[in-house]
């Protein structure tokens, strides 16, 4: 007897009347006149398959006691369903109970509405819900599409280090990595902590970005990307921030900001097309329960050409909009989410690439423009969320990079390896960063980024 996934069984590609076996968990059960109708899911798709068991089965009394969350193996004949909303069902010849739910009354995942706040408290069980099953499959689809896009376009995937000595953003919000005894810290003659006695012989941290490391490979392999976990010790309790998240960071050699923007547009549209093509069932559920525009917004995004606007012009538009914003709009201040959303939703009505930001609000590695006041930076703004991608052309001139590092108070000797790229065959190059969880939030229409990752890490929250 063939073991098949629920997705395969429902797809209509198996012979009707053939014997199949499915393995999964009970979503719901209802009984009627000697019959038990068991909705079984295995996570392969959104829809469950109905297993129909009758009272001729020797363990029918046991089957009737099944509750949501119990695991089973069902064997039987695959037939067209007589009920509405389902294509096929299984007429069971056997149902073996593999695992019972200890106490159905206290089982946290009940077949009823549950708030996201409650589900975060049981994050180890929430993938069993319809919502988090859908989010997880979409997250997987996006991750697979990321690698596929870059592979098809000639990029090499680079595994950048998680433990580092460098602050790629220059913000200082990093998690320290140490094996020193926190109760009896070794001290040097000045009384400072003696990190030479630590595991790596120096101060080390969890990475905030793989960009600096991946640039090294860009300047040898031309087109590269990294896709991995990053960490920010930012004491932020908003719905938009995580302490641990995943970043996608491509880097292209012999490229300027315009080429960087084109890559970002092609990349996002490829990802959204993949989700529409591969996860229509999950998007349909999200459109019904979470975000009614879940499908329409992705289609609109794909079909709309990106608008490009200079930061200076964006500030003027915002100042002349007549709209009262919570945060001030002045040249030299970073744009806030409310400003970004006004530009992309109310004024332009499609994705926007804002370019050439004031140099003092952007990172030290961004290329200084000829005006000496701005850098070749970009933010891609999407309707409904604001910034979704941040990128720049990198500073390839050693003297300018050194001046920028001095301006930011960074020790150039500490970044000597990064400066080497500008000493040996330097070329113009560019790249961007896309927070993977922010992408999942946008696609799924979630209101809190903590629901876009399996086990959220945030200030005061590191369970599981």
UniProtKB/Swiss-Prot annotation:
GO terms for biological process: asparaginyl-tRNA aminoacylation. One of its GO terms (molecular function) is nucleic acid binding. It comes from the Bacteria. Coiled coil: none annotated. CDD domains: AsxRS_core, EcAsnRS_like_N. The keyword Cell membrane does not apply. PROSITE patterns: AA_TRNA_LIGASE_II. One of its GO terms (cellular component) is cytoplasm. Its EC number is 6.1.1.22. Gene3D superfamilies: Bira Bifunctional Protein, Domain 2 (3.30.930.10), Nucleic acid-binding proteins (2.40.50.140). Keywords: Aminoacyl-tRNA synthetase, ATP-binding, Cytoplasm, Ligase, Nucleotide-binding, Protein biosynthesis. It is found in: Cytoplasm. It catalyses: tRNA(Asn) + L-asparagine + ATP = L-asparaginyl-tRNA(Asn) + AMP + diphosphate + H(+). The keyword Hydrolase does not apply. Belongs to the class-II aminoacyl-tRNA synthetase family. Homodimer. This is Asparagine--tRNA ligase. It comes from Xanthomonas axonopodis pv. citri (strain 306). The gene is asnS.
